[in-house]
C-alpha cells in the first residue's frame, strides 16, 4: 500500500512539474491570461494576434500548454480553437486563474 501511494504521489508531482514548466514562459502566461479574460474558446490565430506571437512560435506554445493539460484544442474545418482546461487549474493550482 505504501508503494502504490508513493507511485501515485510521484505521478502527481510529475504532473505539477510539467504544469510549472509550461507556465514558466511569459508568452504562455499571456496565452492563459488571454483565454481566461475572454471567458470562451478562441481560434489559435486570435490568441496569437492578441498576444503578439507569430504563428510558428504560438503553435509551439499551444502544444506545450496542451501537453501539460492546461488547454484543450479542437479543430473545426481548417480552424483550430483553444480553450482553458479549468479542471486542471482547479485540481493543481486552485485560485491561480483569479490572480491573472
Swiss-Prot record:
Keywords: DNA-binding, Repressor, Transcription, Transcription regulation
PANTHER family from the UniProt entry: LMO0101 PROTEIN, TRANSCRIPTIONAL REGULATOR, ARSR FAMILY
PROSITE patterns: HTH_ARSR_2 (PS50987)
Coiled coil residues, start to end: none
SUPFAM superfamilies assigned to the protein according to its UniProt record, in alphabetical order: Winged helix' DNA-binding domain
Domain annotation HTH arsR-type: ranges: 8-100
DNA-binding annotation, residue ranges on this chain: 44-67
Gene3D superfamilies per record: Winged helix-like DNA-binding domain superfamily/Winged helix DNA-binding domain
Lineage of the organism: Bacteria, Bacillati, Bacillota, Bacilli, Bacillales
Protein's name in the database: Uncharacterized HTH-type transcriptional regulator YceK
Organism the protein comes from: Bacillus subtilis (strain 168)
Entry's Gene Ontology molecular function annotations: DNA binding; DNA-binding transcription factor activity
GO biological process: regulation of DNA-templated transcription
Amino acid at each position: 500500500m505504501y508503494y502504490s501511494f508513493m507511485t501515485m504521489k510521484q505521478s502527481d508531482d510529475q504532473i505539477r512539474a510539467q504544469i510549472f514548466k509550461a507556465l514558466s514562459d511569459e508568452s504562455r502566461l499571456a496565452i492563459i491570461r488571454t483565454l481566461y479574460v475572454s471567458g470562451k474558446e478562441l481560434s489559435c490565430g486570435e490568441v496569437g494576434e492578441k498576444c503578439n506571437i507569430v504563428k510558428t512560435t504560438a503553435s509551439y506554445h499551444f502544444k506545450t500548454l496542451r501537453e501539460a493539460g492546461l488547454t484543450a484544442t479542437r479543430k473545426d474545418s481548417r480552424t483550430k480553437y483553444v480553450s482553458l482546461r479549468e479542471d486542471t487549474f482547479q485540481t493543481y493550482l486552485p485560485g491561480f486563474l483569479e490572480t491573472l
